[in-house]
């Protein structure tokens, strides 16, 4: 990668050709932005790998921050400043006749949050990386996290902000880390090969949760953590028949369509619950699987992870990790509960009764029968 202005200019012009098949002078400004963004992302790749290796090799304890929103804003300038390459890029682009500020304006605000809850989560991730701690975020990869305000015929209207329309240069899709999340169906008990009574979910609607990883770059310290965004795709397991496949696809699309669906209808309220479970189930399954791969055991997971739940939205993480440990990994109730009570933490944002979430028993028992049993 580049370490000076001359190397930067050479790399920038080369990438214009390799990415778009044309000289830099023929690239559109959005293409120039994408070239710069991918250069910055690739610049931190070695530090990203080193940070992961350090955690794995030293068996470090990690924080995983679950939040329905992360108001991270635009990342281009922040990432270049944290990497210490902003001035090199600015001067190199200027020599090429490109104003870096024009490229900065091409970046969309990430549609992952819209308020103080999301800004707090983003600040935590930024601070954790800059302090050199291994701490990561988990969120949904919303298609439309924001609304844009426009004036049409003299009136203010809100329209969806299609922030992913021109791609997100910071994310890397990781299909090999996909997990299966199950909704509906029924919980049944059975006897395993050791004669123990276990539970499992059957006849469920299965969704494949696919992660997209975004680097969270610490300030000039070579530490790079991860914000993992989950997207819903059709599962290869238990696909519905052609007659109901369209409804299945619609259900998948709804999961990641937007932040905080309208809860004035029953459908909207159930969708919120589905989103919340989708996030925590995908994130926890991924963490448990990674821990087993690194450590070869699960009885010490509470010594290696702490899961921070940002407000009430990810609270289903508590019964879900119980389900994962008991149903999928053979833990008894007391063993699982010991792990859970030593690795779950919660941030409360209000004590107003009307702002605290409550779900009808029928919603949880129908949508998540096994989780309902555990609760």
Regions from the language model: what does each represent?
Residues 1-375:
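A conserved ligand/cofactor-binding region detector
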């Amino acid at each position: 990668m580049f370490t000076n202005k001359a190397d930067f200019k050479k790399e920038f012009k080369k990438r214009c050709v390799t990415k778009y098949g044309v000289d830099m002078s023929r690239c559109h400004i959005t293409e120039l932005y994408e070239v710069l963004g991918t250069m910055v992302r690739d610049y931190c790749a070695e530090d990203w790998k080193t940070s992961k290796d350090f955690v794995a090799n030293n068996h470090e304890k990690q924080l995983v921050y679950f939040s329905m929103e992360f108001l991270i804003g635009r990342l281009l300038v922040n990432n270049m400043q944290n990497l210490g390459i902003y001035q090199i890029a600015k001067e190199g682009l200027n020599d090429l006749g490109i104003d870096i500020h024009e490229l900065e304006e091409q970046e969309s605000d990430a549609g992952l949050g819209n308020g103080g809850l999301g800004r707090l989560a983003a600040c935590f991730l930024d601070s954790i990386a800059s302090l050199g701690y291994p701490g990561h975020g988990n969120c949904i990869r919303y298609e439309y996290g924001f609304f844009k305000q426009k004036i049409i015929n003299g009136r203010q209207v809100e329209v969806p902000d299609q922030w992913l329309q021109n791609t997100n240069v910071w994310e890397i899709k990781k299909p090999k880390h996909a997990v299966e999340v199950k909704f509906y169906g029924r919980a049944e008990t059975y006897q395993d090969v050791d004669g123990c009574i276990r539970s499992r979910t059957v006849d469920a609607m299965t969704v494949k949760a696919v992660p997209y990883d975004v680097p969270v770059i610490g300030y000039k310290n070579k530490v790079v953590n991860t914000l993992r965004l989950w997207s819903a795709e059709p599962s290869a397991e238990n696909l519905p028949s052609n007659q109901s496949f369209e409804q299945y696809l619609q259900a998948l699309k709804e999961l990641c369509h937007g932040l905080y669906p309208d809860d004035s209808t029953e459908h909207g309220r159930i969708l919120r619950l589905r989103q919340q479970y989708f996030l925590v189930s995908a994130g926890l399954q991924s963490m448990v699987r990674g821990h087993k791969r690194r450590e070869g055991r699960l009885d010490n997971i509470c010594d290696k992870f702490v899961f921070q739940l940002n407000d009430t939205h990810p609270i289903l993480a508590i019964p879900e990790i119980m389900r994962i440990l008991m149903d999928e990994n053979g833990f008894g109730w007391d063993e699982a509960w010991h792990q859970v009570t030593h690795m779950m933490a919660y941030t409360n944002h209000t004590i107003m009764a009307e702002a605290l979430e409550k779900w009808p028993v029928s919603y949880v028992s129908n949508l998540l029968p096994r989780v309902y049993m555990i609760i």
